Amino acid sequence: MGFSKKTYTKEELLPFFDRTRSRGPDMSQILETPSGWLCFHRLAIMGLTEAGMQPFELDGDYVVCNGEIYGFRPLKRQLTEKGYSFRSGSDCEILLPLYREYGLEMFAKLDAEFALIIYDSKRDELIAARDPIGIRPLYYGYDRSGAIVFASEPKNLVGCVRDPPLPAGTLLRGRKICIRYADLTTVTQYSPDDLETVCRNIRNKLIAAVDKRLDADAPWLPALRG
């Protein structure tokens, strides 16, 4: 969760936060920013130690992310070569260095499923973003003072004036600046390949999609459905 203002004390926001404790049973954290709050329940998958707990911090900026960053290890090596250091094996720890390097353009560069909130200390504002497909949920509403509140589930926002979920492939900066950084419904070109080639390419993409999801420090179990 993210609160853009300190309308609530830490004790007052706990009932909102605790409604989704089951989403992250491993650890929980509430961080006070200069103007608001960031809250995170952790389900540890990458970087299982306490060092992988969020929010992550970089020079006064903070991030909380419900997501998986695919292929993060090459990105991490590139950022290390640029002088960034990391304290955990979490894939999400690369997000603030990426934000430092690319700003809002970082979201279009990610191969990931995510719903995240960044606190930008220089602007003293929250930036919320959701992956291009909308795999990870992100809702927002307004508290009793009109401050914006972000959450993973609508029940976190009971008592707030709620808006629809943040659309897939968009980011919200501050209260009003909504930017679409990706639109998968727009087709820019069509494949001229024959049916056999198309089917082979689809098969290869499906294999690659499964393979990149197998990178985890926690034990995993495949489940088939459909």
Language model features with spans:
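Cysteine-centered catalytic environments shared across enzyme families
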Residues: M1-G226
